[in-house]
């Protein structure tokens, strides 16, 4: 047989299977397009020249890796559905005399055509929309728009290599499936596995434990740094638990309902319970995938939108003044009054001045004693680690409106954690009397509250220096130094002020930065996270659409047979339709409900992770999450309604 014969046969096969092949090709095209755009943006020289694009470029590079992994998993998963639906077709070819090597050639041309269309359209659309994405990013980070056309050879090469490799592996996978199966097995493969599912108690218990432990970690973890460590553990546990929930726990629960004879042997209950058992067995993995993808969309959109919405609030709280300077080592010995006089001589008039010296260190309090060596304490100690900020009273007296005084052995204490019960604190071997525990500290409003922390207010700078010496005796070379902080507002241009300060020999040991620069850096970071979050959310929604579409096709062909069987045993067509359609609704909306449950339990941990990125407005995150869930639920319903038309078309045609 000639090459043209195999090519024509491959084209005919693609046309005959257009209902399932076209959505797959469309998904492959969109995945290729998105991969090209992200790679192109990450390597775009015009983007790299923009102010504040370094972090954004790094975020895009991270997005490239995620998209490549997703493309491999998702294209492989959806192709497994296609190859399963075509088993009978391959069996007929074999019965008609076509050998497996001939089938291999036909599949080769089918795969090659699909790959060519995916690359050609995907890269073409990527080039078309690449500039639009570039302009959106430039607008997000407030950069100047650079006009002109840019083609990414790296993006095209990456798409050809990655998508090409995926299709090569898909081709070999299909060859293995055909090689190990006989024509008879292929012919009847779509009718296999119709035995009643068994209750899997062991896997059900494992699933419940995985979900329970994952939820427990999220709810009970208090320290944001610990939350970051446990987040990935909790995610893995919940993913495992989700798969077991749909594959084992649901079937086990339905089995228990079946054992209740008073409940089970009623017409409505009998049909719904028995039907749901088979549906859960056949659709479990797909439903779990939809649930996990839905959860990922909700989490990504809610967190990234919360971060982007809080930029101004974060900047104002973290950087309360226009210009900020930090001095370490010898620079920390500077006299603040002399510094203010120097600034005035330079023509810079500092307003709303905040200036203090501070000693920072970490540890945790145990019965009023600072524990500094926790290397042998394990994860429990990590959970307890607290930050300590020690300041002299005179530096913050005016800012905090404190009128009282302290003796050398007395301290004021403020904590965002818990009330100190002890009357004295032992810090680096020296006892300090807690004169008062403060209820509020103004300067803590600009602290990101990443961990539990204490402000220790001592009577003088001399006492602070003595505490630093005591700390050095404990930590040695790892001891922290006293830091001088000097910040102010001014009428002049911030960047010009920073430039002048850096050129002054008397104060050039300070590291100066401006509020506008810090805001630009934050915009750069959050813009990258938001862009990748929206990009990946679109990918996951696209995957959800395709899975639901294929599930509707599967349900349609299976329910066609169920309609016939139930009508033959005497059930009215209206009752059969009502029972089956209610089962379909339950099956397809269960992932959305479980995803909502996952998001609710994920809230405590995600809230703490947002603290690491300085987002501490919990109510903003709650509102954003609720909005995202409602919006996604509406999209989910629209997807279901649109894909269900395929289902009803199959059932009505065959009922």
Language model features by range: what are they?
Residues 3-5, 180-194, 557-558, 648-655:
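Short cytosolic juxtamembrane segments of multi-pass membrane proteins
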Residues 113-257:
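Hydrophobic alpha-helical segments
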Residues 19-46, 55-91, 111-125, 205-206, ...:
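Hydrophobic alpha-helical transmembrane segments of multi-pass inner-membrane transport and secretion
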Residues 3, 7, 11, 105, ...:
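Alpha-helical membrane-protein architecture signal
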């Amino acid at each position: 047989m000639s090459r043209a014969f195999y090519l024509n046969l491959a084209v005919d096969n693609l046309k005959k299977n257009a209902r399932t092949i076209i959505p797959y090709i469309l998904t492959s095209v969109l995945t290729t397009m998105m991969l090209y755009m992200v790679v192109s943006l990450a390597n775009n020289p015009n983007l790299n020249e923009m102010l504040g694009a370094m972090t954004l470029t790094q975020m895009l590079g991270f997005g490239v890796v995620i998209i490549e992994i997703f493309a491999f998993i998702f294209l492989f998963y959806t192709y497994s559905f296609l190859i399963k639906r075509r088993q009978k077709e391959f069996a007929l070819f074999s019965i008609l005399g076509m050998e497996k090597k001939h089938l291999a050639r036909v599949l080769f041309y089918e795969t090659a055509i699909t790959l060519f269309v995916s690359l050609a359209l995907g890269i073409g659309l990527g080039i078309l929309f690449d500039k639009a994405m570039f302009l959106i990013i430039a607008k997000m980070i407030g950069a100047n728009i650079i006009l002109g056309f840019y083609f990414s050879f790296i993006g095209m090469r990456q798409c050809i290599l990655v998508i090409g490799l995926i299709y090569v592996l898909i081709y070999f996978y299909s060859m293995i499936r055909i090689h190990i199966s006989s024509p008879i097995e292929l012919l009847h493969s779509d009718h296999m596995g119709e035995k009643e599912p068994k209750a899997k108690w062991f896997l059900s218990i494992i699933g419940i434990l995985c979900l329970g432990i994952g939820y427990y970690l999220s709810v009970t973890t208090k320290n944001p740094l610990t939350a970051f460590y446990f987040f990935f553990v909790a995610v893995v546990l919940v993913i495992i638990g989700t798969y077991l929930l749909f594959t084992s726990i649901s079937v086990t629960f339905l089995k228990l309902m079946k054992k209740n004879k008073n409940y089970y042997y009623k017409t409505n209950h009998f049909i719904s319970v028995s039907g749901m058992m088979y549906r859960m067995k056949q659709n479990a993995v797909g439903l779990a995938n939809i649930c996990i993808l839905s959860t990922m969309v909700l989490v990504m959109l809610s967190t990234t939108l919360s971060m982007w919405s809080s930029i101004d609030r974060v900047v104002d709280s973290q950087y309360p003044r226009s210009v900020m300077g930090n001095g370490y080592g010898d620079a920390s010995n500077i006299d603040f009054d002399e510094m203010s006089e120097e600034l005035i001589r330079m023509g810079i008039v500092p307003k709303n001045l905040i200036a203090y010296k501070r000693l920072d260190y970490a540890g945790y309090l145990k019965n009023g004693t600072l524990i500094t060596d926790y290397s042998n304490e394990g994860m429990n100690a990590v959970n307890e680690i607290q930050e300590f900020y020690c300041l002299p009273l005179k530096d913050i007296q005016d800012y905090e409106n404190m009128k009282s005084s302290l003796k050398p052995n007395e301290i004021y204490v403020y904590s965002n954690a818990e009330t100190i019960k002890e009357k004295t604190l032992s810090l680096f071997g020296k006892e300090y009397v807690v004169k008062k525990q403060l209820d509020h500290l103004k300067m803590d409003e600009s602290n990101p509250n990443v961990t539990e922390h204490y402000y220790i207010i001592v009577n003088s700078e001399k006492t602070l220096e003595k505490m630093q010496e005591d700390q050095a005796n404990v930590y040695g070379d790892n001891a922290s130094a006293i830091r001088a902080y000097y910040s102010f507002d001014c009428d002049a241009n911030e960047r010009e002020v920073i430039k002048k300060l850096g050129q002054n020999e008397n104060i050039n040991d300070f590291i100066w930065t401006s509020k506008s620069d810090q805001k630009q850096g934050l915009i750069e970071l959050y813009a990258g996270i938001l862009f990748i979050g929206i990009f990946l959310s679109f990918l996951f929604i696209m995957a959800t659409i395709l899975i639901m579409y294929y599930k509707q096709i599967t349900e349609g062909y299976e329910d066609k047979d169920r309609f016939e069987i139930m009508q033959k045993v005497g059930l009215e067509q209206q009752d059969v339709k009502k029972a089956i359609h209610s089962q379909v609704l339950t099956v397809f909306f269960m992932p959305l409900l479980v995803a909502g449950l996952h998001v609710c339990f994920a809230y405590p941990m995600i809230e703490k992770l947002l603290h690491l990125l300085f987002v501490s407005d919990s109510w903003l995150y709650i509102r954003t999450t609720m909005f995202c869930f409602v919006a996604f639920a509406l999209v989910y319903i629209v997807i279901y309604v649109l894909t269900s038309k395929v289902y009803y078309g199959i059932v009505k045609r065959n009922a």
